[in-house]
Amino acid sequence: MRYPIHLALIERFVVLKTGADYKCQVVFQTTRVLALLAVFFLIVTSTTAFGQLRAADSARAAKYSESKRGISMLVMQNGRTIFEHYANGGSARGRWPIFSGTKSFWGIAALSAVRDGLLKLDDPVSDTITEWKGDPRKSQITIRQLLNQTDSIEGASRLQRASIRDRNATAIRLPTVAEPGSIFIYGPSHLQIFSELLRRKLKGRDTTAYLEGHVSNRLGLGRLNFKKDARGNPLPATGFELTAREWARLGELVLGRGNYHGRQIVPATLLREAFAGSQANPSYGLTFWLNQQAPNGPEGDMERMLDLPWQNAQWTNVCICKDAPTDMVVALGSGYQRLFIIPSLKAIIVRQGSNAKFSDAHFLRLVLGRGG
C-alpha cells in the first residue's frame, strides 16, 4: 500500500555536535513524526469507516422497507453477508417476482452473444430482421438501441398479455414514434425484438436455452419462468422469480467484472458497455439503471416516472440517490424490487416487496449511514 504522507513535511534530521542540541532535535523530530502519523491514522480509519457498511444502518433501512410492505432485504460487502432480514411473509428460500429485474439477465445474455461472435452492439437490427430494411427509421436502429430502449419504437406494454400468441411477430411490426436514438421509451417491445433477433442469430435454436447455458445456469439459478407464448417465445421484459440470495448472484457477477466464482461469464470490457448511458437517457444503460448523474442531478422515483407518458418523462439529469456513489448500478423491477450494486464499496443490496409507496433515495441513505 502506498501511504500518502508527503515526505517534504517531515523535516530532515540533522545530528548536531553538542549533546544538548542533539537531544532537543531528537525530541522535536520524534514529536513531529508522531503527530503526522496520528493524523494519517485518523484519515485512514475515517476513510475505512465511511466505506464499511454497518449492520445497524441496514437494520434501520430494513425497518423502513418492512413498513412499506418489504418482504426481504440482503446486504453483502466484500463477498460477505453483513445483514439479512425477512418480513411480511418473506423467507430466505421463498422466491419472489423480480418483474423488470428480469431484463438485466437478458442484457448479460446479449453481451455473451457479443463475446460469442453472434452479434455486435452497433450492428443494424435490419441486417438480421430484414423486414426492416425498407423502413427509413427502422433500418437505422442498432442492437445497442434495442438494449437501452432508445430505438424509438412504441413501448407496447400489451405484449405482456398471455393472449398474444406470437409476441415476436407482434413486436417487430410495431411503429416508431421518432428518430432512433432521440428518445427513451420504456417497455417490453425492445427486448422482445431483441429476442427475435437472437433467435435468428441462433438459427432457430431456443433463446431460453442460450440464456440458461450462458448466464443463469452458471449463476446456479435453477429453473426460471420465461412466460413463453404459444409459439414458445419468452417474455424477456419480466417473469423471473428469485430469492434475495439468488438475485444477489447477478450483483456478484457485476462486482467480479463479469466473473462469477472464478468463471468468466462475460469479458470485463464488454460488461462496461452495460453501464454507459445514452444521450436520450444518461441514467439507463444496457438493461441496467445508473446513478451517474449524482450528486448534482435531482433524485427521481423511476417507477413513477415510467408511469408517465414518454413525452412527459425527463431523463436528462435525473439520479436515483444523490448520496449514493455515482458508480452504483441497479436492476429494477415493478413494486420496488431492487438490486443495488455499488462497485466502489464492493456492496450488493437486495430489496424485495409488494407495491407500496417507497423511496429508493431514503432507503439508500439509511443503508449507507448518511441520514434519511
Each PLM stretch: what is its role?
Residues 34-45:
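Bacterial N-terminal signal peptides
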Residues 49-51, 55:
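Boundary at the C-terminal end of the N-terminal hydrophobic targeting segment
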Residues 60-90, 339-342, 346-350:
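A short, well-structured edge-of-sheet supersecondary motif
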Residues 79, 96-122, 146, 194-198, ...:
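Active-site SXXK
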Residues 112-119, 199-208, 216-224, 243-266, ...:
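Bacterial peptidoglycan biogenesis and beta-lactam-recognition machinery
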Residues 115-153, 173, 202-238, 242:
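Active-site helix/loop module of the DD-peptidase/beta-lactamase fold
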Residues 193-197, 239-259, 337-351:
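Active-site-proximal alpha-helical segments within enzyme catalytic domains
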Residues 221-224, 277-348:
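Active-site Gly/Thr loop motif
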